[in-house]
């Protein structure tokens, strides 16, 4: 057993990350091919009258078997990853360059359930969307994003590199338990959707694969790598814009909303010079002026809807955490 653990620990987490990214790209391609040559779209549930936002990829006539197929696989996926997080925290390992046994187990579990989801879509189609609200899947990821803002406040600040003290204090409890929530948010959202081959779905599944990969590398140095983690945060820009374009929604609001979070908050966690930051600001401002000069300046303030929601939620949630967080938690962390 000790020899096995030593061999596992020699597997570099950086190499595991690269292999995981390659797997994610290849599997996204498999979803496209499956939708092109295998899947046939069933009769979908029509949009009810008076519903503003509607997720149309739901069976019009679901059965107990179609529902059971997705719920059993979802619960198996969720339970296995939560169990691995629990066992890992029980061991209290140090962050290492190599993989731990539970990293290997998490990577294999995620790869298995990703593959099962493809077959489940091809045979039974439905995701969790049949039984839960669309807003639950959306907000599960939104909460994940602003929780990252809270946890990273101590390292990169919240606004232009400036830290908010009480947010850093609130991050202590979040940092300890965030793995359970992040695992739920990603796995729940992953099983919400059938593996459909639209642009938005393909980008969304690629993003979910990368988040599952990040979650599998807990207690390794790559899990904390700022370039990788900020890449994950910023990737949501592309996904949100593609979904907005496909749905005919207001794509500039999502593009500049999420880019605004990047230039105001996230890029201050990157090891780049002040000159490079100014260049990024100039590029952001130039594109913003160009788009809204064409679109019209009467709605320019909409860019604060997305970024403002994330910042406000991060600050308000931090205040709520401090109200319920035991007073000795901060001193214990220190």
Residue ranges and their predicted role:
Residues 100-105, 159-185, 203, 220-235, ...:
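Cytoplasm-facing juxtamembrane segments at the starts of transmembrane helices
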Residues 69-82, 138-156, 206-214, 255-267, ...:
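Hydrophobic cores of alpha-helical transmembrane segments in multi-pass inner/ER membrane proteins
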Residues 2-119:
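An N-terminal, globular interaction/scaffold subdomain
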Residues 82-179, 191-196:
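Membrane-interface helix-loop-helix junctions at boundaries between adjacent transmembrane segments
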Residues 2-6, 80-98, 152-172, 216-229, ...:
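Cytoplasmic membrane-interface regions of multi-pass membrane proteins
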Residues 215-296:
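Intrinsically disordered, low-complexity segments enriched in Gly and acidic/Ser/Thr residues
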Residues 59-65, 159-171, 187-196, 211-222, ...:
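Short juxtamembrane and helix-loop transition motifs at transmembrane-helix boundaries
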């Amino acid at each position: 057993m000790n020899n096995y653990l030593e061999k596992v620990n020699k597997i570099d987490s950086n190499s595991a990350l690269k292999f995981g990214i390659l797997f994610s790209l290849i599997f996204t391609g498999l979803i496209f091919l499956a939708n092109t040559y295998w899947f046939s779209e069933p009769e979908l549930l029509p949009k009810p009258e008076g519903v503003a936002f509607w997720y149309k990829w739901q069976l019009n006539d679901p059965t107990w078997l179609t529902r059971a197929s997705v719920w059993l696989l979802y619960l198996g996926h969720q339970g296995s990853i939560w169990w691995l997080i629990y066992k890992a925290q029980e061991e209290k390992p140090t962050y290492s360059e190599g993989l731990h046994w539970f990293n290997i187990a998490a990577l294999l579990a995620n790869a298995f359930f990703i593959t099962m989801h493809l077959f489940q879509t091809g045979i039974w189609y439905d995701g969790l969307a049949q039984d839960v609200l669309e807003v639950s899947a959306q907000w599960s990821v939104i909460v994940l994003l602003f929780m990252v803002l809270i946890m990273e406040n101590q390292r990169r600040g919240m606004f232009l590199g400036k830290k908010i003290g009480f947010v850093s204090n609130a991050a202590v409890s979040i940092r300890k338990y965030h793995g359970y929530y992040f695992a739920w948010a990603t796995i729940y959202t992953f099983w919400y959707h059938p593996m459909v081959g639209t642009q938005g779905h393909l980008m969304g599944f690629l993003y979910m694969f990368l988040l599952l990969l990040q979650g599998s590398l807990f207690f390794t140095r790559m899990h904390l790598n700022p370039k990788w983690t900020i890449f994950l945060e910023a990737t949501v820009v592309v996904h949100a814009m593609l979904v907005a374009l496909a749905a005919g929604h207001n794509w500039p609001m999502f593009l500049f909303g999420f880019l605004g979070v990047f230039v105001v908050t996230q890029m201050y966690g990157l090891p780049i010079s002040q000159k490079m930051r100014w260049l990024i600001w100039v590029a952001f401002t130039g594109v913003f002026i160009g788009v809204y000069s064409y679109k019209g300046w009467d709605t320019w303030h909409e860019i604060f809807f997305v970024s403002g929601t994330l910042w406000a939620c991060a600050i308000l949630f931090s205040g709520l955490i401090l109200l319920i967080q035991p007073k000795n938690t901060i001193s214990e962390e220190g």
